[in-house]
């Protein structure tokens, strides 16, 4: 069974997440929640010790009703019961919005956005930004796709920011990004996604048109403090784009050495190569993350 409730393989959408993928991704994202490992083992492996630990904990707490949800999860792999258990343990707004987004946008590529490589890369970024401890202010998220990084930044208890503006040239992205980040869209547009070529952005101060949920236009004005681009390998005319960013801006960049993909037109071979195409006055962090087929590189600094 899939998260979208589609059990027939011929009807599966690109956005569906199988039960094992759903459990794996949330265990990866929230590795500090030890019960998620028991939940995965109970549902996928029918591990008796895990089932016993979970059911015993429910029985002695005020959450005895969850025993029935656990039974349905283990015996039927009931998606709604699994989601209720995940909501109980994780207690994050993003779980509910992700579920609704998958149902409402069956043709989206949410499965790719929540791949292990994507989540590892973004979790790494969040971890290093937490260590640096700088207030991000207004964030311009370039090539923001479905805004999963925005969700992780908002949910971090150690990262402080004012708002996130996500820009992507793909017109199918903004509604999905806003669906996933709905709690922050509803909070006076603390999150807002816009269809925009990032080459046309003024990174000093930017007046631009965006769409409300009813698709009527509204003009916005923002002055970014932080520029994030985790898709540098996709950016055409890289130097032209990089030159648009003023000195003094906090920049967070990721690229990779996955040259084999034709859409990767701006890969780098190592951190030194990355620094040579994205020179900064001060580097606050440089590093790499091995991801099997390729290595991802990250630069955080003041241009």
Region locations from a protein language model:
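S-adenosyl-L-methionine
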Residues: 3-5, 12-135, 178-221
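Conserved class I S-adenosyl-L-methionine
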Residues: 135-146
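Conserved SAM-binding loop of SAM-dependent methyltransferases across substrates and taxa
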Residues: 146-160
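Short beta-strand element of Class I
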Residues: 162-167
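Conserved SAM/SAH-binding beta-strand->alpha-helix loop
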Residues: 169-172
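A short SAM/SAH-binding and catalytic strip from SAM-dependent methyltransferases
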Residues: 221-238
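C-terminal substrate-binding/active-site "lid" region of AdoMet-derived donor-dependent transferases
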Residues: 236-299
């Amino acid at each position: 069974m899939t998260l979208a409730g589609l059990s027939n393989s011929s009807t599966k959408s690109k956005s569906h997440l199988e039960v094992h993928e759903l459990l794996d991704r949330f265990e990866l994202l929230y590795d500090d929640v030890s019960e998620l490992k028991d939940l995965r083992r109970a549902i996928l492996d029918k591990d008796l010790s895990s089932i016993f630990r979970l059911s015993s904990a429910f029985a002695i707490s005020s959450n005895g009703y969850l025993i029935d949800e656990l039974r349905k999860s283990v015996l039927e792999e009931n998606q709604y019961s699994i989601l209720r258990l995940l909501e109980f343990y994780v207690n994050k707004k993003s779980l509910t919005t992700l579920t609704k987004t998958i149902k409402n946008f069956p043709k989206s590529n949410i499965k790719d956005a929540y791949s292990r490589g994507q989540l590892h890369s973004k979790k790494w970024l969040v971890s290093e930004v937490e260590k640096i401890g700088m207030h991000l202010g207004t964030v311009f998220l370039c090539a923001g796709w479905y805004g999963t990084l925005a969700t992780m930044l908002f949910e971090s208890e150690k990262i402080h920011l004012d708002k996130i503006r996500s820009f992507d040239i793909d017109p199918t992205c903004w509604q999905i990004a806003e669906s996933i980040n709905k709690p922050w869209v509803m909070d006076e547009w603390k999150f807002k996604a816009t269809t925009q070529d990032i080459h046309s952005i003024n990174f000093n101060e930017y007046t631009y048109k965006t769409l409300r949920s009813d698709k009527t236009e509204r003009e916005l004005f923002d002055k970014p403090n932080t520029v994030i681009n985790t898709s540098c390998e996709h950016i055409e005319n890289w130097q032209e784009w990089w030159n648009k960013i003023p000195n003094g801006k906090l920049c967070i960049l990721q690229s990779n050495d996955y040259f084999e993909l034709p859409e990767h037109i701006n890969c780098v071979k190592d951190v030194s190569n990355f620094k040579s195409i994205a020179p900064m006055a001060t580097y606050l962090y440089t590093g790499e993350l091995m991801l099997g087929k390729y290595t991802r590189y990250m630069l955080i600094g003041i241009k």
